[in-house]
Amino acid sequence: MSEKPQKSQKSEVKDYSKTLFLPQTEFPMRAGLPQREPEILKYWNDIGLYDRLRQEAEGRTKFVLHDGPPYANGNIHIGHALNKILKDVVTKSQQMLGFDSNYVPGWDCHGLPIEWKIEEENYRKKGKQKPDFRDSAAMVAFRKECRAYATHWINVQREEFKRLGIIGDWDHPYQTMSYPAEAQIARELMKFAANGTLYRGSKPVMWSVVEKTALAEAEVEYEDYTSDMVWVKFPVTSPAHGALASASVVIWTTTPWTLPGNRAISFSPKIAYGLYKVTDAPADNWAKTGDLLILADALAAEVFKQARVTTYEKVRELPADTLDAVECAHPLKGFSGGYEFTVPLLPGDHVTDDTGTGFVHTAPGHGREDFDVWMANARELEARGINTTIPYTVDENGAFTDHAPGFVGKRVINDKGEKGDANEAVIKALIDAGKLLARGRLKHQYPHSWRSKKPVIFRNTPQWFIAMDKDISANGHAKKGDTLRARALHAISVTQWVPPSGENRINGMIANRPDWVISRQRAWGVPIAVFVREKSDGSAEILQDEIVNQRIAEAFMEEGADAWYMDGARERFLGSRASEDWKKVDDICDVWFDSGSTHAFVLEDRQNFPQLGNIVRKVDGGSDTVMYLEGSDQHRGWFHSSLLESAGTRGRAPYDIVLTHGFTLDENGRKMSKSLGNTVEPQKVIKDSGADILRLWVCATDYADDQRIGPEILKNTIETYRKLRNSIRWMLGTLHHFKPSEKVAYAEMPELERLMLHELAGHAETVRNAYAAFDYKTVVASLAAFMNSELSAFYFDIRKDTLYCDPPSSPARKAALTTIDLLCDAILKWLAPILSFTTDEAWRMFRPNAEPSVHLTLFPADIEKLRDDKLAAKWETIRNVRRAVTGALELERAAKNIGSSLEASPVIYVADRDMLATLFDTDLAEVCITSNYEVRESEAPASAFRLDAVPGVAVVVEKAVGTKCARSWKISQTVGEDPEYPDVTPRDAQALREWKALGVGV
């Protein structure tokens, strides 16, 4: 190493810091987002940002993200925040990609949760009686209370969503309870009535005794529950099987209360069955010695164990293909004079020999598969003289009706959701009849209502359905095979699903789903606004009268759906037909039908939503796009109901793209729960750190899967944000000295600037493609890596000397400022959809005379043309050499041989002549931030520093020779050459003269 350079005496050192072009900006280092963001929201409101966005986008192709409506009940939670932020990023990025991306928020307003709240807060807590909905005035008054409650929470949630930085038409949101919406929902229902797919049927539905309503699949969750289980004997009666005359088919069930509704036994043709004989059993046992039992071979041993049978033998095999001719008696035959009917055996694909007996007790009024098997065989059963009418054995209160002789009034579940006395009553009757083989208890997963958290039952009820497999009629004519299921499956195949796995998921649901139950027996909703009369076969004829329908729709438009429940509504709407025997249906529509119709009263309503109502999608010969975006549970929710509603009335899906996100868990991967204390409230994150932190967290995660959030994850997000903000702040401060009139043309720029623009071009392609593909984590990862590694740690670090110390006239300095201006412009625009507040604050400092908001700009265009792959390849070599030099400098600094890298003058040994030629015209001192350097084509000393990743390069760090420049701190032998400024280099002396010429004292 060379000798240490001579240091100047302290008394001789001048302070040139004021002559440096250091960054200057009012953009603060500390973000202060919780205080600053509300000011930015006010600014957006003051400039009319939403309206300006619409004006800027006029005439563009439309990309509309149609809002899946949150429920107007309670404050928003972290799932709401994730969902709304994603929607906002989609909307803003599509707008900046050149589309007209208009976001109209909406709310789901009807339904049971609000009814529950009103009943609880306005009635139960006050000791008041729940309204009698048979009274028109009471019904209308209750509905007004529900409307007021929903309105309150819409206003609360609206402000919470706006605080997240969501830009949309908050002054004109859609609401499923608005009068135009209720009118259109009624019209949509009438379309199903007109095309022949709406019908009143008898079918088992999931029923909540506590809530007194049918539940959709999306409203049911499975929880642990302990059930009674029984093994029951059904005596064989069919004369064709004389050999089995004394035998019994054994079934197993965990719902003994459904046995009064039993009408068949299902078996599988794929299972091996046998006839078994009990050869020994305890005297007090329900299974008796000599009993002949028909069982699946694979389950016989377990059944006899449960029945406490000591020994048994298999009498004979019983081929499954002989079972469909077997008929049995009901085990309660003769009980209270009932159950005097034949119980046939029917083949069913749902039967297995994993558990039970290999036979499934089939009560078509209490199970979906039971119903399907029964109806699939209905014609054949009727030909055999078997009545296929499905009984109504259980009423809305969970009590047995007179269709269950001997058990009338017994409760399956009581009003509190507790197990009633029905099971024990049925079991006792079975014991008395000698038909119980065994009993026990089983803890298993059982369906519960997602609201009341109480168990539900399947019960046969009159409900309104939309048929999935009936040919759809148009003007009285139906095309064979043109069913709702067929239409929906086709629509799925021509929709873009993000991620693609969503297609298989919803396809499977549609392919296998039953008819769509759309009725609820509640008060707060849009009524099933049709009139019916009873037919002789027990079905309902729906009035098809366009004048009546128009009268209803017009009334709803002016007065809301309350008009249906007012005194005199029947006579008002029927008009001259009021004398006929038409009855008004008082059931309401399922809320999924409400929200499934939003496309009709938002995307197609030119009067109330004029900027959305003129959408012309590709399926209609246009170029506009509609996206739906919700959580993955909406494959069976809003995506599902919207698809069925639109396919049934318009023959296509209401959307072109469907994007789904996962659920939010705590940082340990657990479901959030107040009882666990692991919830993350968006309001607290905003108060502590700001909405931009939440926005960055959302976009940095893989939203397609379940995401995690918690203190440590937020801490890491804040650190990522801090680095991004610091880079933006440095660029803004540096550009304080930039004059647009001094821009440097690309061809005149140094290689380093052209290299950075090449890198910018690469990221431009990545970012645009990622935004177009809704891949926001790639946007964040790409820009964070670019800003931290390529800019802050490489380019900015190298160029600080040029930017701070070069004379104002320096071409290199002007080129660097021109480049940073381009970088800052692109980065602020690219980050705008994500860091909406931060980038807008920065934009107004960066471009004070341009657009008043970064959100009014487009993503930068034509950057891709700045690519220079040849230059990038050259600089890959240079940067490899820099890595070797940096490694050597770090060792010397650790050994305290040097402090700053400017104290060094590395000697770089290069063995490869091609590499040597590449380095020939490169100032490696500038690139490596040293005061000098030397490149040698010779053998390096054994002690030289080497990197395995950079073969052929070795580095020896020597001390820089010369005097330390008092201004730039570089060590140079040229210090002192300028007599006017003898303590600085000639470069710095020229800068000082130019400063002096500007009137600055130096």
Curated annotation (Swiss-Prot):
Monomer. GO terms for molecular function: aminoacyl-tRNA deacylase activity; ATP binding; isoleucine-tRNA ligase activity; tRNA binding. ATP binds at K674. Its main location: cytoplasm. Keywords: Aminoacyl-tRNA synthetase, ATP-binding, Cytoplasm, Ligase, Nucleotide-binding, Protein biosynthesis. Catalyzes the attachment of isoleucine to tRNA(Ile). As IleRS can inadvertently accommodate and process structurally similar amino acids such as valine, to avoid such errors it has two additional distinct tRNA(Ile)-dependent editing activities. One activity is designated as 'pretransfer' editing and involves the hydrolysis of activated Val-AMP. The other activity is designated 'posttransfer' editing and involves deacylation of mischarged Val-tRNA(Ile). It is found in: Cytoplasm. Pfam families: Anticodon_1, tRNA-synt_1. It comes from the Bacteria. The keyword Protein biosynthesis applies. CDD domains: Anticodon_Ia_Ile_BEm. This is Isoleucine--tRNA ligase. Its EC number is 6.1.1.5. A motif ('HIGH' region) lies at residues 70-80. GO terms for biological process: isoleucyl-tRNA aminoacylation. One of its GO terms (cellular component) is cytosol.
